[in-house]
Structures are given as C-alpha cells and as structure tokens.
C-alpha cells in the first residue's frame, strides 16, 4: 500500500495588473488587486508529490481551514491509490459542512492531487492517462471587470485580439460595455458575457431581449440565485445561449440543470465540484444532453493545469479559459495570458512546477500534517 505521508497547504496571494480600472466581480471585491490560490501538496511513501488546488479568491481562508484542520489529519497514513474510496469516505460523513463551499473546494484539491500521483505512477501526462490524445489547446481570454468603462473594455478586447484570441469573455454588466466589445472585434470573433449572477429573472430576460440579435456567444450566470434552473430556462427562451455551472457541485444539480433545459454550455469548476473524479462524471453525464462542456478556469495554480488536462481529454475540442491579467511574477511556465495557444508536454501527471523562487514572497500561510 502506497501511503500518504504528508499533506501541505500553501496559500498564495499573487498581485496582478488588469490593463484597466480595477473593479471586483462582486460588491465585496471593490478593487481586486491580488488573486489567491490554496494549493495542496501530497507526499507519498513511494517518494512522489501530487498537487491540487482548492477554490481560493475570497473563499481561500475557509478552504485552507478545512484542509488543515479536518481533511489532512483524516488522510495522512491512508492509501493514496484508491482515489474514489478516499473522497467518498470523506464526503458522506462530512456532509454536515455542506454539499458546496469550502468542504467541496478542499476535497477538490485532495482529489486532484491524488490523480496527479496516479498519472505519475503510470508514467503518463494526466490528459493521456484520462484517454486524451493531443495536448494542444486553444485558449480564450477572460477579461477582468472594468466597471463599465467602455474605453477600457474596447482597448482590452483589441489587445486580446492582437495576441491572437478569437474568443473573449467580459465580466461587465452593462449593455454599452457589451456593445463596446462587440464593436471592437470582427464578425467571426466571439464575445462572451459573464455577469456573475446580478439580476432577477425578469431583469435578465429584459437584457437578453435587447441583445438577442447582436451575436453574443453566450450569457453566463445572469440570475441570482445561480441554482434557479427554471429561471435560467426562462432567460434562455430569449434566444441568447446560456452558460452556467461553476457554482454547481453535485451530480444531482448538474443533471437537473440539463434536464430543465436551462443551459447551452456547462461550466463545471475542477477546484469547486470535487476535483478530477467529479469532473469526469459530469463530462460523462453531459454526453446524453444537448450541451457543450466548457470548464470554468479563473485561477492560475494546479487547478489551471488540471483544467487544461481535462480539456485535452475531451472528445470534442474544448477551449481553456485564461485570465487576461499580468501577474507580478510568472507563477509557472504554463500560464501565459499573451498567447491563445497552450501545449501540454509529456511530463507525467499534472506537470505543475511552480516558480517558487519568485512565489515564496507572496505566500500568506502554509501548514503541513505528516505521518507520525
């Protein structure tokens, strides 16, 4: 039995530049200046290290606490090979902590790290271990929110196009900003609208009606609460393709979203829903519904690598979301916001090799639980 010898959490807060005015995606993030990641490193008795990432951002303290205080003490000394058994035996007894939120984010990190280890033992990059053939991916640029500043929107859309991006996502919430982006690109370019759950169903329908003939590629999470699938289905009737899924975690809810015909694009997040194991089940489940799986990926740590490998393992080419920002230091060689292409090499596992010489100074906290 290959045992888990140690689990370390590393919380990093990495400063970035947006290329425009700073506005958070939500009211609690008025001026977003740093992107937090909660990484997990699992060491095993065969001398390997596996990496995973829990959803961070404003949720980082909660994800970190669950890893350090609950999951790590329960897992150290256990078998690292039986991935499904490890996660299932934790998810059920801990369900009192919720079926979403920090518990699932923390489990996502653990699960991903265990898959990293499994692929390393098979001497395969994760995407090949999952059945993929090509490690070449097309990315799409995911812009920050510029507070409705139409000049900043147009300038950054044009800048993204200059790097080769043909699909660009906004995080604005106003129609003038939407149109500024649409007018800054060619007809065959795709503009996506991620509005982060700001509207009622009636408000979202009104917006969708107004922009329905303007060729936007999708409207993402237009209503609150995000799990109101019947409401999403109503908005979808206005003719704009609907995307959602980053705030769904259970298979039951993913199935309900598709059965309700609420969405066109399903966007599960590997750092939120339960890691590689749950993502594989979601992708398989979606095959029998008329939806396209496009994983959410607004992060830069091992979760970025995991999403890339999952995208490369899909039968249908899947674009990789990449935050269109400039970090204070290069976190690792795979993250490049100035290129619309990414190629995974043949390094076994995730291939996550962080630039710790530069990242060390941005570590907020770290903790480790080891076998006695």
Predicted regions, residues:
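Flexible C-terminal active-site loop/helix
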Residues: 2-5, 9-12, 16-19, 32, ...
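N-terminal basic, low-complexity leaders that serve as flexible interaction/assembly modules and, when applicable
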Residues: 1-73, 359-372
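Conserved, mostly hydrophobic/aromatic
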Residues: 4, 47, 71, 110, ...
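Metal- or metallocofactor-binding catalytic centers and their adjacent structured scaffolds
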Residues: 7, 43-121
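Active-site mouth loops of central-metabolism enzymes
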Residues: 136-152, 195-200, 243, 247
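Catalytic core of soluble alpha/beta enzymes
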Residues: 170, 175-302, 329, 337
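Catalytic domains of carbohydrate-active enzymes, especially glycoside hydrolases
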Residues: 159-168
């Amino acid at each position: 039995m290959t045992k888990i010898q140690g689990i370390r959490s590393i919380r990093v807060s990495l400063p970035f530049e947006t290329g425009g005015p700073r506005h958070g995606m939500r009211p609690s993030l008025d001026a977003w200046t740093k992107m937090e990641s909660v990484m997990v490193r699992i060491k095993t008795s065969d001398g390997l290290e596996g990496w995973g990432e829990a959803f961070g951002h404003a949720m980082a303290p909660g994800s970190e606490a669950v890893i350090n205080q609950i999951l790590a003490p329960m897992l150290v000394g256990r078998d690292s090979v039986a991935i499904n058994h490890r996660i299932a035996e934790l998810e059920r007894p801990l369900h009192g902590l919720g079926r979403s939120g920090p518990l699932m984010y923390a489990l996502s990190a653990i699960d991903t790290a265990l898959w990293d280890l499994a692929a390393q033992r098979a001497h395969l990059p994760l995407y090949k271990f999952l059945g993929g053939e090509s490690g070449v991916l097309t990315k799409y640029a995911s812009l920050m929110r510029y507070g409705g500043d139409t000049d900043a929107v147009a300038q950054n859309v044009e800048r993204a196009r200059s790097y080769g991006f043909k699909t660009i996502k906004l995080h604005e919430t106003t129609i003038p900003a939407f149109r500024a982006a649409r007018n800054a690109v060619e007809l065959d370019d795709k503009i996506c609208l991620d509005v982060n759950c700001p509207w009622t169903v009636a408000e979202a329908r009104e917006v969708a009606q107004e922009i329905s003939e303007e060729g936007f590629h999708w409207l993402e999470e237009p209503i609150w609460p995000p799990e109101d699938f019947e409401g999403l289905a109503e908005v979808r009737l206005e003719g704009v393709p609907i995307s959602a899924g980053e705030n769904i975690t259970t298979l039951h809810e993913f199935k309900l979203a598709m059965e309700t015909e609420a969405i066109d694009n399903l966007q599960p997040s590997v750092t939120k829903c339960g890691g590689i194991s749950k993502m594989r089940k979601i992708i398989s489940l979606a095959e029998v519904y008329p939806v396209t799986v496009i994983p959410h990926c607004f992060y830069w740590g091992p979760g970025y690598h995991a999403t890339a490998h999952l995208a490369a393992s899909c039968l249908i080419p899947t674009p990789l979301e990449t935050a269109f920002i400039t970090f204070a230091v290069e976190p690792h060689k795979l993250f490049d916001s100035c290129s619309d292409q990414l190629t995974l090499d043949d390094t076994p596992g995730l291939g996550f090799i962080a630039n710790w010489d530069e990242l060390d100074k941005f570590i907020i906290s770290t903790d480790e639980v080891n076998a006695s």
